[in-house]
Amino acid sequence: MTPPHARTWSRRGRYPVVRVRGRSRRRISIAALACYKPGERPRLIYRPRFHLPWKGARKSFAWTDYRDLAVRAHLQLGAPIVLVWDNLNTHRSAGMRQYAADHDWLTIFQLPSHAPDLNPVEGIWSLLRRGALANVAFTDPDHLTRTLRRALSQIQHRPDLIDGCLTETGLTITPNLTLIQKASVPVNWPPVRA
């Protein structure tokens, strides 16, 4: 664990020493999807990943982890998914693009580069940093994991917070009327003139 101190002091001419017990090299990553559908309550689906402390082990999510998160969301929601992702290189990987092309229930759009203010999940992370993670000195990685799960569970049960994260971006969810209109047009329309 890294020390919870942002700053420290010492006498002039002395080097400050901060003693920390239980230093750990374990790493935890979390990916989340904020799910919105007009007329229904929003949902938050997340997946933690506990990284192995071995040399050469991957220190972040792989595209297969994001694929598994999308599959989990598809199974929970029981409907096709339109993912709107930031431009993380793992989101744009060839494996993820191929997976989306092979499955008709998955459509992926990319947010513009350097636009975290358009991503509702950034609002979720902000809620965590300002709430449950603020001014806490975690004793070990398990303490951090328990705190994160509890805080994310509380956010999952507050749809107004998840809605607020979308509202903060300035984006709105509207059904695609052109798709609805195309579906209502007869198959042999327009009539062929001889």
Give names to the regions the model predicted:
Residues 63-82:
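Short, basic/hydrophobic alpha-helical segments
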Residues 26-28, 79, 104-107:
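Short glycine-/polar-rich loops that comprise or flank the Walker A/P-loop
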Residues 83-97, 113-118:
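Acidic, metal-coordinating catalytic cores used for nucleic-acid/nucleotide bond scission
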Residues 1-68, 173, 179-192:
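Extended, low-complexity cationic-aromatic segments
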